[in-house]
């Protein structure tokens, strides 16, 4: 894993699980239309987590100024001054605030996709998540290694 994944491993474990659990709550509920509920969740998650992380990279790594960030955000319908002020101020004042959740969610979602592909019909998300949670908090590469061993044992069980 990269430096950022190692540096944010433990906060990413907690925050990533929180984001993934919110997604599961929507997927497993049956009170509301699932597609509509997912859209609302992703609409909230995209600007709240992912766009904050992206804007922080744009400002702090690429060196974008406020006007340049406004141009970038306009491509996503977020070019109004209030949005730009929010994202720019967050990037300057809290440059790493959104990274643990964004990276943690991405790592956990990737791990679950990999396990699903490896286990095929034997994949049970609830069992995989219970096993994942029993190992953590831990660094991503260690979690993946342990989950691979667990997946191999599931295949051996048949």
PLM regions with names:
Residues 1-14:
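Post-HEXXH active-site segment of zinc metalloproteases
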Residues 11-27:
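An active-site-proximal "capping" alpha-helix that borders the catalytic cofactor pocket
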Residues 14-15, 19, 48, 52, ...:
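Short alpha-helical patches at coil-to-helix transitions and adjacent helical residues
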Residues 21-24, 58, 107, 131:
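Generic structural signal for bulky hydrophobic/aromatic residues embedded
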Residues 23-93:
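Long, amphipathic alpha-helical stalk/connector segments used for oligomerization, subunit docking
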Residues 77-158:
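C-terminal, non-catalytic "cap/extension" segments appended to globular domains
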């Amino acid at each position: 894993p990269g430096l950022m994944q190692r540096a944010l491993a433990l906060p990413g474990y907690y925050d990533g699980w929180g984001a993934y659990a919110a997604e599961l709550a929507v997927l497993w509920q049956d009170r509301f239309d699932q597609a509509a509920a997912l859209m609302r969740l992703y609409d909230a998650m995209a600007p709240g987590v992912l766009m904050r992380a992206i804007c922080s990279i744009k400002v702090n790594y690429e060196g974008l100024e406020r006007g340049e960030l406004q141009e970038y955000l306009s491509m996503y319908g977020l070019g109004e001054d209030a949005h730009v002020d929010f994202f720019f101020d967050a990037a300057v004042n809290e440059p790493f605030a959104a990274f643990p959740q964004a990276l943690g969610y991405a790592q956990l979602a990737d791990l679950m996709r990999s396990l699903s592909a490896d286990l095929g019909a034997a994949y049970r998300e609830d069992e995989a998540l219970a096993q994942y949670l029993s190992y953590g908090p831990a660094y991503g590469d260690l979690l993946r290694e342990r989950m691979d061993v667990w997946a191999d044992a599931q295949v051996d069980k048949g």
